[in-house]
Regions:
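Sensory-domain boundary/capping and coupling elements
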Residues: 2-8, 82-94, 100, 104-111
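Sensory modules in modular signal-transduction proteins
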Residues: 3-30, 35
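Cyclic nucleotide signaling catalytic output domains
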Residues: 167, 194, 198, 204, ...
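Conserved long alpha-helical elements within nucleotide-processing catalytic cores of c-di-GMP signaling
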Residues: 89, 100-125, 132-162, 168-172, ...
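Sensory-module boundary signal marking interfaces of small helical input modules
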Residues: 81-84, 134, 185, 250
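PAS-family sensory domains
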Residues: 1, 65-80
């Protein structure tokens, strides 16, 4: 077979290749390429191993040098792979039901808030919000309705929290709020009361109308703990004290 025939077969073979492929000679001359490569805008032929094109797609460029000094360039669309990786990262740090940060991300946000407070000589408040009698309600309504109720609770609580603060799902019927950069403890009580008011409004689940309440425990950095673990533990103790004293109230640790 002549060189011309070999080249013709090569061009035909890669013409309909599913990825963008280009074969170049040692002097950089384009010998053959797939239709997909030919259709690429030059701006989409980046030099980086992975890059985002002008139209938003993620592409991976692989370049292999041949024995004769030529090269094979492969550009693969990895947009779906990137989306899957982003989804996996999101799930690693967020609750699947509510979309809120999970305990893992909560711990990280607490550490960040404490570091900021130490630099600026401020306080950090950790609030644990436990819904009163939710388990019995969940058993009565069914888990599907209970999940819908928890999503609505999460949305209402989120509306009470500043962007700089963190609302997380800490347990089945428990939410945590980290209020950072506090100057005064009274500001934390205002936040707690807003959370209670948000839950006091009537809920609708299917054809049912429901009322919810919550017991809230609060701990403060640095007075009640020097790290996130201590703050969460003491907020939990304060929350249980609120339940012991009749529920539907706010209690500060040690008070």
């Amino acid at each position: 077979m002549s060189k011309a025939d070999e080249l013709r077969l090569l061009r035909e073979a890669i013409k309909t290749f599913p990825d963008a492929v280009a074969i170049r000679s040692a002097d950089g001359r384009l010998i053959a390429c797939s239709d997909l490569y030919a259709g690429l805008n030059p701006s989409m032929r980046g030099d980086s191993a992975e890059y985002q094109s002008a139209d938003g797609r993620w592409l991976r460029r692989t370049l292999r040098t041949l024995d004769d000094g030529g090269s094979v360039e492969l550009i693969a669309d990895i947009t779906e792979l990137r989306r899957a990786e982003q989804a996996a990262r999101f799930l690693a740090y967020h609750d699947t039901l509510t979309g809120l940060p999970n305990r893992r991300l909560l711990d990280d946000r607490l550490r960040q808030a404490i570091r900021l407070a130490q630099r600026r000589d401020r306080m950090v408040a950790t609030l644990l919000v436990r819904l009163d009698d939710f388990r019995q309600l969940n058993d009565t309504l069914g888990h599907g309705a209970g999940d819908a109720l928890l999503r609505e609770v999460a949305q209402r609580l989120a509306a009470c929290v500043r962007k700089a603060d963190t609302l997380a799902r800490a347990g089945a019927d428990e939410f945590a709020v980290v209020v950072c950069d506090l100057k005064d403890k009274a500001d934390c009580r205002v936040v707690a009361e807003k959370l209670q008011q948000a839950l006091a409004a009537e809920f609708r689940v299917g054809n049912r109308r429901l009322r919810l309440a919550a017991s809230i425990g609060v701990s403060l950095f640095p007075a009640d703990g020097g790290d996130g673990e201590a703050l969460l533990r003491n907020a939990d103790a304060a929350m249980y004290r609120a339940k012991e004293l009749g529920r539907n109230q706010v209690r500060f640790f040690g008070r």
